[in-house]
Curated annotation (Swiss-Prot):
Gene3D superfamilies: Endonuclease Chain A (3.30.870.10). It comes from Homo sapiens (Human). InterPro entries: Diverse_PLD-related, PLDc_3, PLipase_D/transphosphatidylase. It is a single-pass membrane protein. GO terms for cellular component: membrane. CDD domains: PLDc_vPLD5_1 (cd09146), PLDc_vPLD5_2 (cd09149). Belongs to the phospholipase D family. Pfam families: PLDc_3 (PF13918). One of its GO terms (molecular function) is catalytic activity. This is Inactive phospholipase D5. Its main location: membrane. It comes from the Eukaryota.
Amino acid sequence: MEIRQHEWLSASPHEGFEQMRLKSRPKEPSPSLTRVGANFYSSVKQQDYSASVWLRRKDKLEHSQQKCIVIFALVCCFAILVALIFSAVDIMGEDEDGLSEKNCQNKCRIALVENIPEGLNYSENAPFHLSLFQGWMNLLNMAKKSVDIVSSHWDLNHTHPSACQGQRLFEKLLQLTSQNIEIKLVSDVTADSKVLEALKLKGAEVTYMNMTAYNKGRLQSSFWIVDKQHVYIGSAGLDWQSLGQMKELGVIFYNCSCLVLDLQRIFALYSSLKFKSRVPQTWSKRLYGVYDNEKKLQLQLNETKSQAFVSNSPKLFCPKNRSFDIDAIYSVIDDAKQYVYIAVMDYLPISSTSTKRTYWPDLDAKIREALVLRSVRVRLLLSFWKETDPLTFNFISSLKAICTEIANCSLKVKFFDLERENACATKEQKNHTFPRLNRNKYMVTDGAAYIGNFDWVGNDFTQNAGTGLVINQADVRNNRSIIKQLKDVFERDWYSPYAKTLQPTKQPNCSSLFKLKPLSNKTATDDTGGKDPRNV
């Protein structure tokens, strides 16, 4: 005991404390318990690693999915953007046939075409032009690829003795269908035409426009496009009376694909409405106008520097860059400095519904403005027939009244009356002659001309479908100028015995008519025509 105590006391202080520390340490676990703990720890650690790997993979998968969604959304947005760009951009006005403002033909020939009813006699030195029938036949004879026609009437195959020209035209159209020439025709859905059905059976493509559903109106457009090169625009539809009984007027453009480039889009607009009962809220960019009143087509007409554009009605049918007919007429009247000559069948500034009639001032007010504010001379040549509205005389009297006691205010009005001249016809002529009517629809000034499909009646412009043509020329004195030719036609009719002043009950002097010479065979061969007055 003493020895152990001595040993402890003799030991160094550091050694004693170390031994005490070692003795105070807990006993180490047995090897078996150590192995179990190690295995448990390893298992937990492995599970934790697996969970972390799974979470990392899940994060990567979610991130990858998000990237795919973002990429897909970007691709869709890019595709939509490209589609919108290509639908919005119309490079240089190019159409589906590759025709564009860069490669179209703007050096054109233009000719007036007229339809002079049988028995309508002018003086020997009066101007005459190519007959409507011959002009149409010329176009069909020139056709090699396509014929596109818009017309409100399709009654060519009639049994009346004066319907022979209509029958010949119908036979020519049938012939073209067998020559691999593409025929496209547009008509109003109300047209019950055996001619259209016959042409359709032969392969012609026929589009019926439901103007009643679109705008409570009807189709009155009348124009042709042949081989994407030649154009007719005028008052006449494809009706045997337009080639026999009615006085019609229009123009034919030859080799004028620049004008076709624009007019073809109106035809395409009509065709796009096939089988549709409503007008789309937005028109395709391919139907936008190429030229309008702000951007006129620059061209040569019979080697005369000219400008031109086509207009459309109703306003519902005027996509972007397409001039409304009323605006086109405004531009012609506003540019007039000396005179405005207007030849239409009816003049009635009234908009009518089934329950009421309201004043429609659009054109009436423009005429008054030209008379009073700019001292432009105005002449109105209207038709007098059984459907002339009595209110027409009231409005004409009102127009004349505003020039009372106003210096340099000149308005003159005449009625072109072919019906009363039947009193001068022989018994044989009366037995087989249908009512004749002047259906011209044009205006000419000292620098421009407008040729359209409408009379100057409110409902025509607001509800019906029609196309107009405006031509501007600086040099209107040479005989090749279409504006001078149109002015000469107006003055020929104005000074003829068929044009009467505001006295609708006065009977004609038959003896004065017998002094006039009939048309020569050269000019009268194909000039007999007009429109069915029941459908005007």
